C-alpha cells in the first residue's frame, strides 16, 4: 500500500467509526432517486476505504484522485466494480462531473477553502449541483463555518458559507484516527446548499462589504466601512435597522448583514464600487 505523501497533504483515515459517521451524514437513502442509482462524487479517495463503503450502498461513485500511484491501486482494487468511475487529475483544475448530487471527501486541509469555493460557489455565483456535501476538515475550520454572532470564530467565511448553505458539525475526529496522525483535530461537517439563497441586491457588493467589515474586526462598523461609505451613512443604516450604533462586524447576524448591504448600496450607490478582482469568484 502506498505511504501517505506529504506534498499531497495525505493522511489515511483508518478509524471505521468515522467512515460510518460520514456515510450516515451523507443520508444516501434520503436522496431522491430516479430509475438509476444515485451518483456520488468523492474527492481524494486515497486507498479506497470510504469508496468501498459507498459502493456497498449501491451508488455510482465518481472518484477524483491526483496521485498516480493511488490511481493504479484504485483501478486494481475496483476493477470488477462497474459503478466505480475514476478520474485522474487535480480536482481544482477539472470541471465538475455533471451527474453527482452528493459529495463526500477527506481533503487536504490546505485546499479546503479552494474546494469549498468550487463546490459551493460564491454569493454572486452559487453552485446548486449538490444536495449534500459531507467533508472531513480541520476542526478549527468547521467551527468557523458554523459560528454565530459574538463568537471568536465568526467571520466573513462564516457568513459567506451560511449564505450559501446550512452547516452542521457531525462529529469531532481525533488525530489518532489517521495514519500518520496530523497535528490538529478534525471534524466531519455536512453542508446542505440552499436551493435559492436569500435575495440580496448586489451579491458582489455584499461579499466586498463582508471582507471590509471583518478586515479590522475590533473596529466599530462606522469606522471599518469608512473606506467604502461615509460614516454618517453607515450610522444612519444601523439606526434604520435598530442596531447598536457602536456595533462591530461580529455582532451582526446574516439577515442584518444582508439588510445592511442593501441599505448601503441604496444610500451610497456611487461609492459602492467593487474592485475588479472581487467581481468573479476566484
UniProtKB/Swiss-Prot annotation:
Known catalytic reactions: adenosine(1518)/adenosine(1519) in 16S rRNA + 4 S-adenosyl-L-methionine = N(6)-dimethyladenosine(1518)/N(6)-dimethyladenosine(1519) in 16S rRNA + 4 S-adenosyl-L-homocysteine + 4 H(+)
Gene3D superfamilies linked to this entry: Ribosomal RNA adenine dimethylase-like, domain 2 (1.10.8.100), Vaccinia Virus protein VP39 (3.40.50.150)
Chief localisation class: cytoplasm
Root EC class: transferase
EC number(s) per entry: 2.1.1.182
Gene Ontology molecular function, alphabetical: 16S rRNA (adenine(1518)-N(6)/adenine(1519)-N(6))-dimethyltransferase activity; RNA binding
Keywords of this entry: Cytoplasm, Methyltransferase, RNA-binding, rRNA processing, S-adenosyl-L-methionine, Transferase
GO CC, alphabetical: cytosol
SMART domains xref list: rADc
PROSITE patterns reported in the protein's UniProt record: RRNA_A_DIMETH (PS01131), SAM_RNA_A_N6_MT (PS51689)
Entry's family note: Belongs to the class I-like SAM-binding methyltransferase superfamily. rRNA adenine N(6)-methyltransferase family. RsmA subfamily.
UniProt name for this protein: Ribosomal RNA small subunit methyltransferase A
Recorded name of the encoding gene: rsmA
Amino acid at each position: 500500500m502506498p505511504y501517505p505523501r506529504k506534498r499531497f497533504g495525505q493522511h489515511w483515515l483508518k478509524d471505521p467509526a468515522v467512515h460510518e459517521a460520514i456515510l450516515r451524514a451523507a443520508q444516501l437513502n434520503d436522496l431522491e432517486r430516479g430509475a438509476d442509482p444515485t451518483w456520488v462524487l468523492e474527492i481524494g479517495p486515497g486507498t479506497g476505504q470510504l469508496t468501498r463503503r459507498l459502493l456497498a450502498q449501491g451508488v455510482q461513485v465518481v472518484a477524483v484522485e491526483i496521485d498516480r500511484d493511488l490511481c493504479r491501486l484504485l483501478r486494481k482494487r475496483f476493477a470488477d466494480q462497474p459503478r466505480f468511475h475514476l478520474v485522474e487529475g487535480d480536482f481544482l483544475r477539472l470541471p465538475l462531473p455533471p451527474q453527482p448530487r452528493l459529495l463526500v471527501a477527506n481533503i487536504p486541509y490546505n485546499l479546503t477553502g479552494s474546494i469549498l469555493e468550487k463546490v459551493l460557489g460564491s454569493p454572486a455565483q452559487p453552485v446548486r449541483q449538490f444536495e449534500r456535501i459531507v467533508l472531513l476538515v480541520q476542526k478549527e475550520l468547521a467551527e468557523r463555518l458554523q459560528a454565530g454572532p459574538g463568537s471568536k470564530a465568526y467571520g466573513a467565511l462564516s457568513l459567506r458559507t451560511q449564505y450559501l448553505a446550512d452547516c452542521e458539525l457531525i462529529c469531532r475526529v481525533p488525530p489518532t484516527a489517521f495514519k500518520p496522525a496530523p497535528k490538529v483535530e478534525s471534524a466531519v461537517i455536512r453542508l446542505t446548499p440552499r436551493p435559492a439563497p436569500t435575495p440580496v441586491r448586489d451579491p458582489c457588493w455584499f461579499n466586498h462589504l463582508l471582507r471590509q467589515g471583518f478586515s479590522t474586526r475590533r473596529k466599530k462598523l462606522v469606522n471599518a466601512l469608512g473606506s467604502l461609505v461615509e460614516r454618517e451613512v453607515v450610522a444612519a443604516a444601523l439606526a434604520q435597522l435598530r442596531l447598536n450604533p457602536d456595533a462591530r462586524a461580529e455582532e451582526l447576524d446574516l439577515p442584518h448583514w444582508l439588510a445592511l448591504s442593501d441599505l448601503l448600496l441604496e444610500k451610497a450607490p456611487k461609492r459602492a464600487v467593487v474592485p475588479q478582482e472581487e467581481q468573479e469568484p476566484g
